[in-house]
Amino acid sequence: MLIKLLTKVFGSRNDRTLRRMRKAVSLINAMEPEMEKLSDDELKAKTNEFRARIGKGESVESLIPEAFAVVREASKRVFGMRHFDVQLLGGMVLNDRCIAEMRTGEGKTLTATLPAYLNALSGKGVHVVTVNDYLAQRDAENNRPLFEFLGMSVGINLPGMPAPAKREAYAADITYGTNNEYGFDYLRDNMAFSPEERVQRKLHYALVDEVDSILIDEARTPLIISGPAEDSSEMYKKVNKIIPHLIRQEKEDSDTFQGEGHFSVDEKARQVNLTERGLVLIEELLVQEGIMDEGESLYSPGNIMLMHHVTAALRAHALFTRDVDYIVKDGEVIIVDEHTGRTMQGRRWSDGLHQAVEAKEGVEIQNENQTLASITFQNYFRLYEKLAGMTGTADTEAFEFSSIYKLDTVVVPTNRPMIRKDLPDLVYITEAEKIQAIIEDIKERTANGQPVLVGTISIEKSEVVSRELTKAGIKHNVLNAKFHANEAGIVAQAGYPAAVTIATNMAGRGTDIMLGGSWQAEVAALEAPTEEQIAQIKADWQVRHDAVLAAGGLHIIGTERHESRRIDNQLRGRSGRQGDPGSSRFYLSMEDALMRIFASDRVSGMMRKLGMKPGEAIEHPWVTKAIANAQRKVESRNFDIRKQLLEYDDVANDQRRAIYTQRNELLDVSDVSDTINSIREDVFKATIDAYIPPQSLEEMWDIPGLQERLKNDFDLEMPIAEWLDKEPELHEETLRERILAQSIEVYQRKEEVVGAEMMRHFEKGVMLQTLDSLWKEHLAAMDYLRQGIHLRGYAQKDPKQEYKRESFAMFAAMLESLKYEVISTLSKVQVRMPEEVEAMEMQRREEAERLAQMQQLSHQDDDAAVAADLAAQTGERKIGRNDPCPCGSGKKYKQCHGRLS
């Protein structure tokens, strides 16, 4: 009560921010007559004038009124469009490192030109981020004439572009691209082997369109660049055959409940749990299939990977549904984005889940991948010096934007008052009754010539509604992940009189629905339209537009509530743009996922008590309140998941930054010999310490062990025992110095043969490759640690603190391994003259031919039998190069049969 009273007196924070900015809007408006007097050349010259002023130390902020006035005037001349005052406010909000909530149809694309131009004046580059390639290309091409008129270059960053084209796009003043592509380019740049391979500049200013979709909906999905791991597709197929034998039970076994099934599903947490009965059956089936030995347990350490396969297969069958979570197209399983309804080509689920779904659907199973580099959007966008975003629905997530990204949300008022009617929800008992009511509503609306947009939450639901509409003889368009190619065209014409469009989730976001349809789309469809044709198209459109306005504007039907209120608001926001009339209504049933999982049982109890007859709907504030509470519950849970993900990823992020900084420094120098010399000292000190403890008695020294270690790991033959026998005065300190000096001398002799320049190049390559290899292994180890760390909670330990502690220890160990591996590799390198290499190659070819002849005579030749036996053993188990050779010769595999294979 008191807060409301204070807000009335002093205004909300939002009001105060807008009040401050309106003063600047007045200044911009006052400059308009002055700008109108300038010639085109004088207006264009303003850009160089602003750049010169910034060069002399003037701040970008001080240029706001003048720069915005210049962009507004240029837009009038180039597009014939003048920025509204609310768009100027939006531009200032975006420049202020804030999120601008601007309703659908308020011209966010044109608003973005203001802060993009202003921040590009510094010459550091501006990245405009969109949700898909179509919008990136459309916005770049639409705004290019304006920016080029003002002397600014525009680049488009699309997937699959060659590196030189990408470098050129990033070098432009303003670059348009998708969130995925910017993130992947960052990861690829940090895997480059030369500075010339990198494409990005320093990350300066990011302007994110549909910021809620990118920074919230996709925050749980990390960007991963991966390489192939071992092939285990056969195992997925075998385990997949077993899963259909299992029966699902309603809930998990407990002290009070013992079910008859084999597994239970927790829909809320999206987890599957095997029951005792299920575990016994799975083990029996695995033994029958010959995958596991009799008497073995699925939980024994040797069967960890098998358990992983079973869990993945069970999740694929119980939690992931075709045409809801994924589609199958051209023999490939493609993920469907749960928030936008779009397909995510090229994205794959991790932890073997994607392979399990492929096995379930009977398509070709692609190899599992190993992570080479990864980053979350949360951490990528926090790398920018300056970040801002815009969307039609941000206010419900303002707390998350503030706590995670330190971005305030400012609600920008609409240019004209909103007059859309949001009708109360109607709740039915069954899904069938609800669908029937939706069909009746559509019939009624279209009979009056009112266009209808039906929003569904999955492809499956959109197809159910489509079938019912077809039965009822109602012509309609379907827009979902299966038909997204003609997305913009369908959305543009969704405002036609009596048009019915079914859209999955928010597919088609970013394209305005114009009442009466889009006359621009009709003109674009003609090859060379004449002035008369264009005038006729506009006149026809005006008639349709007026008819739709008279019918009540666009009507929105939601077939069920989404988990997030924000996505419901996005659907509603498609109607009532720029002060147009419109209406919206959500139809729900007690069988909807949200109602079933999260809304309390009281709602269904209340409906039964009211004695509702089939086909009747309930419309009551209590029900609406229960639904809103259910949505809040889900939003809060999803926020906690994202926050927790970020807290864990922050640990990896600190390490990632350290590694990438080190790697970039390494890339930018041509001579790393000082670093090599420094780490050589550290490595030899640590190696000697293991066999000659510092300040210890000679009796404690392990000289044979040290000699063997130096030979095996550094290819150094050092008669240390002989030195000590011949030189009694040789003590610990001088011995250490001699070992190090000898290693340096051997290394320098190699350098003399190949030349200093070649050696420097080789050193740098070894350091980069070793760093990448160990970082890849470290990422895999961090993944394993992350998956099991929650179990520490049972030991009364904080899993987050344990994760931080262990991952730091692993990181420190990785850095030590890096030093050791680099020095070991450089020490072992064999320098050969060209003629020696040729002779060795000849010898290798002769041995290969001899081996081929031996294998042809294998039934007569014992030696070939050994080779065949060896091949069988290596097929079962991968033999390391330094392992003993299975033929029994006593030699290492690489020096015996490994050399022949």
Swiss-Prot record:
User: What is the gene name?
Assistant: secA
- What family is it from? Belongs to the SecA family.
Q: What is this protein's expression induced by?
A: Repressed under conditions of excess protein secretion capacity and derepressed when protein secretion becomes limiting. This is regulated by SecM.
Origin organism is: Salmonella typhi
Q: At which positions is ATP bound?
A: 87, 105-109, 512
**GO MF entry, a single one:** ATP binding
Q: How is the cofactor bound?
A: May bind 1 zinc ion per subunit.
| Name listed for the protein in its UniProt record | Protein translocase subunit SecA
Q: Which PROSITE patterns match?
A: SECA, SECA_MOTOR_DEAD
Q: Name one GO cellular component term.
A: cytosol
Reaction catalyzed: ATP + H2O + cellular proteinSide 1 = ADP + phosphate + cellular proteinSide 2
Q: Which Pfam families match?
A: P-loop_SecA, SEC-C, SecA_DEAD, SecA_PP_bind, SecA_SW
Function of the protein: Part of the Sec protein translocase complex. Interacts with the SecYEG preprotein conducting channel. Has a central role in coupling the hydrolysis of ATP to the transfer of proteins into and across the cell membrane, serving both as a receptor for the preprotein-SecB complex and as an ATP-driven molecular motor driving the stepwise translocation of polypeptide chains across the membrane.
Q: What is its main location?
A: membrane
- The UniProt record lists the EC number as 7.4.2.8
Q: Which domain of life is it from?
A: Bacteria
Q: Might you name a Gene Ontology BP term for this protein?
A: protein targeting
**Binding partners and assembly:** Monomer and homodimer. Part of the essential Sec protein translocation apparatus which comprises SecA, SecYEG and auxiliary proteins SecDF-YajC and YidC.
